[in-house]
């Protein structure tokens, strides 16, 4: 079977659009990184307070 290949060129356009998109993407990455750090801190707090119950909740029953 023959496969068709298509090439797409960059649309050209304004560099300001790219800069705005890049800045928005950077903001989003920073926000997600902060949210991830907050979640990991919360998990650490739970583990410090009650690690045994946390582990027990994830142990599979029946020797599996």
Swiss-Prot record:
Q: Quaternary structure per UniProt?
A: Strongly interacts with the proteasome-associated ATPase ARC through a hydrophobic interface; the interacting region of Pup lies in its C-terminal half. There is one Pup binding site per ARC hexamer ring.
The family this protein is said to belong to: Belongs to the prokaryotic ubiquitin-like protein family.
Record protein name field: Prokaryotic ubiquitin-like protein Pup
Q: Which InterPro entries match?
A: Ubiquitin-like_Pup
Question: Would the keyword Coiled coil turn up in this protein's UniProt record?
Answer: yes
| Keyword Transcription part of the UniProt annotation | no
In the UniProt record, the gene name given for this protein reads pup
Q: Which residues form a coiled coil?
A: 25-52
* Pathway assigned to this chain's UniProt record: Protein degradation; proteasomal Pup-dependent pathway
Function, please? Protein modifier that is covalently attached to lysine residues of substrate proteins, thereby targeting them for proteasomal degradation. The tagging system is termed pupylation.
Keyword entries, A-Z:
Coiled coil, Isopeptide bond, Ubl conjugation pathway
A GO biological process this protein is involved in? modification-dependent protein catabolic process
Which stretches does the entry tag as region Disordered? 1-37
Organism, scientific name: Mycobacterium marinum (strain ATCC BAA-535 / M)
Q: Where is this cross-link: Isoglutamyl lysine isopeptide (Gln-Lys) (interchain with K-? in acceptor proteins)?
A: 64
Q: Which NCBIfam families match?
A: pupylate_cterm
């Amino acid at each position: 079977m023959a496969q068709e290949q298509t090439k797409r060129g960059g649309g050209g356009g304004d560099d300001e659009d790219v800069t705005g998109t890049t800045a928005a993407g950077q903001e989003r990455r920073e926000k997600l990184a902060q949210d991830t750090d907050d979640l990991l801190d919360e998990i650490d707090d739970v583990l410090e307070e009650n690690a045994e119950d946390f582990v027990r909740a994830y142990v599979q029953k029946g020797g599996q």
